[in-house]
Amino acid sequence: MARSITMQQRIEFGDCDPAGIVWFPNYHRWLDAASRNYFIKCGLPPWRQTVVERGIVGTPIVSCNASFVCTASYDDVLTIETCIKEWRRKSFVQRHSVSRTTPGGDVQLVMRADEIRVFAMNDGERLRAIEVPADYIELCS
């Protein structure tokens, strides 16, 4: 079973559009934070350290597929559950499931996203994908 890490995000008034629901780009900002949180909780060093030690600048997104199930609004507290769904040679699929607890105590799925990400190095001209480091896979398993 894939290792799963959760984090919470309180929705503030400023995160919402005039209708009072979360403005959708904010989900992607929170998913990016959840991605980094996942690697930190699994024991990977901060990107500023990996760039010095290995030349790895981070895990840019190659593709993102998001499905929104219901709305969320300010004062909701979201739980973002993150795992690696699939490891590939030069990429991986990171799944995020975002939920909230209703006033009645039920857990309600708000949205789910699968991101394809790569570990990247800067070769001086551009970012390029590298093979996923085996020790990183081990830390995240």
Swiss-Prot record:
Q: What is the effect of changing residue 17 to N?
A: Drastically reduces catalytic activity. No effect on substrate binding
| UniProt GO molecular function | 4-hydroxybenzoyl-CoA thioesterase activity
- EC number(s) per entry: 3.1.2.23
Q: Which UniProt keywords apply?
A: Hydrolase
- What does UniProt list as catalytic? 17
Q: Per its Swiss-Prot or TrEMBL record, what regulates the activity?
A: Unaffected by EDTA, Mg(2+), Mn(2+), Fe(2+), Ca(2+), Co(2+) and Zn(2+).
Assembly, per entry:
Homotetramer.
What this protein is called in its record is 4-hydroxybenzoyl-CoA thioesterase
